[in-house]
Regions:
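Conserved P-loop NTPase motor core of helicases/translocases
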Residues: 1-4, 48, 56-152
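N-terminal pre-P-loop "Q-motif" helix
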Residues: 6-27, 42, 131
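A structural signal for short coil/turn segments at secondary-structure junctions
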Residues: 26, 54-55
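Short hydrophobic/aromatic beta-strand immediately N-terminal to the Walker A/P-loop
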Residues: 29-32, 60
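Motif I (Walker A/P-loop) of helicase-class P-loop NTPases
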Residues: 40-48, 73, 163
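SF2 helicase catalytic motif II
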Residues: 146-165
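GG-anchored amphipathic helix commonly corresponding to the ABC/SMC/Rad50 NBD signature/C-loop
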Residues: 18-24, 134-138, 162, 169
């Protein structure tokens, strides 16, 4: 793990073993738990912390709903505030009308969103891209989204069918 084992366990004592196994997974890893158990607020944040500690690593964070992507963005905002990071760490894709007003500044201009090349250019300047699966899917055939990321995390994956995710690969 990039950070000292003791520091990692201090930050995430209840799930440090699960996160370590997810981080080391070769292809995919499933974290399942009932609502409110910290899958987004703790597990996803821990994986983001690990990825951000690795220079140049790019992360794709996906969710089924706009509300879930708002929660991911709020987690990232809190993480950036604590870490004292600059504002260009992540980009939010999707419809601005369905995004929390406080997060709309993280989105590319709507006129550029329909242009997959513009989306690729916007996303190449950040380390983290957050999107719903449906907002991301139209751009995948143009430039193969997953070829540009080192790790993808899908929140609330049980709400998605395989047919929603598999075309992205």
């Amino acid at each position: 793990l990039p950070m000292a084992e003791r520091e990692f366990q201090r930050r995430y004592p209840s799930i440090s073993d699960v996160i370590a196994r997810a981080w080391r997974a070769k292809d995919w890893f499933l974290i399942w738990g009932p609502p409110g158990t910290g899958k987004t607020s703790t597990a996803m944040r821990a994986l983001v912390d690990l990825a951000m500690a690795k220079p140049g690593m790019r992360i794709l964070l996906l969710a089924y709903t706009y509300r879930a992507t708002d929660e991911i963005c709020k987690m990232l905002e809190a993480r950036m505030k604590v870490a004292g990071q600059e504002n260009d760490v992540y980009l939010r894709l999707g419809n601005p009308l369905k995004c929390a007003p406080t997060l709309r500044g993280r989105m590319p201009p709507m006129m550029d969103f329909d242009n997959s090349i513009a989306v690729l250019e916007y996303s190449s300047n950040v380390r983290i891209v957050v999107s719903t699966v449906s907002s991301l899917a139209p751009h995948n055939p143009v430039f193969g989204i997953f070829k540009h990321f080192d790790m993808a995390v899908v929140d609330e994956a049980s709400q998605l069918l395989d047919t929603h995710i598999l075309p992205l690969f």
